[in-house]
Amino acid sequence: MGFSSELCSPQGHGAVQQMQEAELRLLEGMRKWMAQRVKSDREYAGLLHHMSLQDGGGRGTGPYSPISQSWAEITSQTEGLSRLLRQHAEDLNSGPLSKLGLLIRERQQLRKTYSEQWQQLQQELTKTHNQDIEKLKSQYRALARDSAQARRKYQEASKDKDRDKAKDKYVRSLWKLFAHHNRYVLGVRAAQLHHHHHHQLMLPGLLQSLQDLHQEMACILKEILQEYLEISSLVQDEVVAIHLEMAAAVARIQPEAEYQGFLRQYGSTPDVPPCVTFDESLLEEGEPLEPGELQLNELTVESVQHTLTSVTDELTVATQTVLSRQEAVAQLQRELQNEEQNTHPRERVQLLAKKQVLQEALQALQVALCSQAKLQAQRELLQAKLEQLGPGEPPPVLLLQDDRHSTSSSEQEREGGRTPTLEILKSHISGIFRPKFSLPPPLQLVPEVQKPLHEQLWYHGALPRAEVAELLTHSGDFLVRESQGKQEYVLSVLWDGQPRHFIIESADNLYRLEGDGFASIPLLVDHLLRSQQPLTKKSGIVLNRAVPKDKWVLNHEDLVLGEQIGRGNFGEVFSGRLRADNTLVAVKSCRETLPPDIKAKFLQEAKILKQYSHPNIVRLIGVCTQKQPIYIVMELVQGGDFLTFLRTEGARLRMKTLLQMVGDAAAGMEYLESKCCIHRDLAARNCLVTEKNVLKISDFGMSREEADGIYAASGGLRQVPVKWTAPEALNYGRYSSESDVWSFGILLWETFSLGASPYPNLSNQQTREFVEKGGRLPCPELCPDAVFRLMEQCWAYEPGQRPSFSAIYQELQSIRKRHR
């Protein structure tokens, strides 16, 4: 099979031309590709050379190490590789690429020559085989007609003269016919031979020579490609040698010995600074105190007990933190072990991030263990000191003994049933240190329409489309949201009972639906709302009412934090302002290190307060839960807590003011009782006082809402304020509004003793035993008899015998009216 036997037809000629065009396109593609390869290799070689220059041949300025030596070898070999690649690029350009260009020119010339020769052969065949023969045949027919006509005239002639003339014409016509016949015979023979030569010799010869040249060019192209591959190959001996040198340099790295040289050069013996000790010079001008020993006397016993409770609570949280972090470390170690078994050694880099997380978790565990150890040591010091005291009374302060001896016996007898004057003294001493705090400066208020989109009440963020219908209730209700996954803003409007959604177009920093553009979406919405212009001419929809987002949700950026004003069980408390309107707020934070279940308890307070609105209940403003740390934002009550207020201002307060303030507390608790809310931690320290001496119930961290008004607690008494808690709650974990009434009785006692601590000389366990035996707190010195009788009713052992908060409030109002 070959061109000469298979491609002689016109269809074969067309196929040959298409094949030549396709091969030329292929060759042109090869030439462009090789030219790009030459360019790329030149650029690559240049980049490698530039990298070597920048790296300085692998010579760093840091300390010597095996890795740096190996890296120097790699960069040096890379420079050699760049020179080799540059030479390869030049060889490609002068060799295969140049030859390929010449081959393309020859192939183009061959295509042109073949086309011209084929056309010439076809033209000659057509002329000889068709045109010339047809012309001879046409002339033959004409001469045959002339001869036949002359013969008829000759045969029909009768006269001699006419006959001779007709004969002469007949003879001439025969001569012409016979001569043309011979020419036709010769023409037919020539055409037959031309036909034979064309189809058997000339056309096959042309095609055969074409095939031979094509095959020769294919052979040349093969040699060009072989040369190209030889030059561009990356497995040449030179390239392989370079890479073997690099591989040897890498193989010389020994991770276990990498830093031995560094340690020999820079290592030194540990220089541990001396541990802190008690500075005895502090005692030179002060009281004769024992260095490093806790002072437990009548002035400090209360603070030591409270500190022990606080440290114990913090130790509980720290222990939970340690356990959670130990579990996290164990989980990470298990995951790493499984992944290392299922990961190829060369994919170990994928595990680095998790290994770093493990190291961070181990470090965090060490920090938690350190915190736990510190708290444990502090608790042991406090416990040992209190156990050393035993059930007896704390030793007196020497400085105050003379004052105590000068007191008359009648006064001592009276003080047996009243609050000791020493307690009032301690109250005033502690009041000297009442914390003062400054507020962050007011912010310049921005008009609502100029606030950014995320601060607009009607902007709901990435609200799912399915939830829009639940928020839009009346025709014309609208909100703006972010389209999920499309980074577009959508205006959603309820119209004719159906939610309609309009994509807000953004172009050239302008926002529009139809018509004019505006510099911001708030400006666009404000214009549509004020002008009542239809959103689109086709829809005719107009905006009527903006649907605000959940009022409790705040962003961390909505707050400006001031200084720390306190500390709770979960974290610090700060003063602050809302950026939107400069509202003063108190911001309670939750430590990031707390376990999730503790954080859930922190948010319990906000969950409770969301439902309440009362002048004597501290007001919730919002929560920030989008990121850490979590905040609960509440109104800022600038007067501080009620306990500190009593200890600092109590001596200057009128009796009516004290009655009014406990009446405020009763009103707040009456409201909570109506909502079936159990506070569980009612005490003076958990009430706040405004600048106008209005009291507000606060600190709902332990509060619970129960439909039947009874809450059964579990988990022990580690965080229970024993001296304020009713017997049934301590014994059985049964909390109710009646148990809050017991705590309110203690609050009354704190109020009229001006901030003294209940059961000052008793531990928590001793207090429980004292109450179970029927013991109760004595009447404070300044307390009206009617109020003390109310206290005693609050301390009835049986919960059902205690008054309700409604009755307590009415009784306090009555006492206040009677009091001058």
UniProtKB/Swiss-Prot annotation:
Its main location: cytoplasm. One of its GO terms (molecular function) is ATP binding. It is a peripheral membrane protein. Its EC number is 2.7.10.2. The keyword Flavoprotein does not apply. Residues 559-820 form the Protein kinase domain. Autophosphorylated on Tyr-711 in response to FGF2. Phosphorylated by LYN in response to FCER1 activation. Phosphorylated by HCK. The modification Phosphothreonine is found at residue 419. It is found in: Cytoplasm, Cytosol; Cytoplasm, Cytoskeleton; Cell membrane; Cytoplasmic vesicle. Residues 1-298 are annotated as: Important for interaction with membranes containing phosphoinositides. The modification Phosphoserine is found at residues 65, 406, 409, 714. Residues 401-417 have a biased composition (Basic and acidic residues). Residues 392-418 are annotated as: Disordered. GO terms for cellular component: cytoplasm; cytoplasmic side of plasma membrane; cytoplasmic vesicle; cytosol; focal adhesion; Golgi apparatus; microtubule cytoskeleton; plasma membrane. Residues 123-163, 318-389 form a coiled coil. The modification Phosphotyrosine is found at residues 259, 711. Transmembrane segments: none annotated. Residues 1-258 form the F-BAR domain. It is an enzyme of class 2 (transferase). GO terms for biological process: cell adhesion; chemotaxis; peptidyl-tyrosine phosphorylation; positive regulation of microtubule polymerization; positive regulation of myeloid cell differentiation; positive regulation of neuron projection development; regulation of cell adhesion; regulation of cell differentiation. ATP binds at residues 565-573, 588. The coiled coil domains are important for regulating the kinase activity. They mediate homooligomerization and probably also interaction with other proteins. The N-terminal region including the first coiled coil domain mediates interaction with phosphoinositide-containing membranes. Tyrosine-protein kinase that acts downstream of cell surface receptors and plays a role in the regulation of the actin cytoskeleton, microtubule assembly, cell attachment and cell spreading. Plays a role in FCER1 (high affinity immunoglobulin epsilon receptor)-mediated signaling in mast cells. Acts down-stream of the activated FCER1 receptor and the mast/stem cell growth factor receptor KIT. Plays a role in the regulation of mast cell degranulation. Plays a role in the regulation of cell differentiation and promotes neurite outgrowth in response to NGF signaling. Homooligomer. Interacts with BCR. Interacts (when activated, via coiled coil domain) with TRIM28. Interacts (via SH2 domain) with phosphorylated EZR, MS4A2/FCER1B and HCLS1/HS1. Interacts with phosphorylated KIT. Interacts with FLT3. Interacts (via F-BAR domain) with soluble tubulin. Interacts (via SH2 domain) with microtubules. This is Tyrosine-protein kinase Fes/Fps. The lineage of its organism: Eukaryota, Metazoa, Chordata, Craniata, Vertebrata.
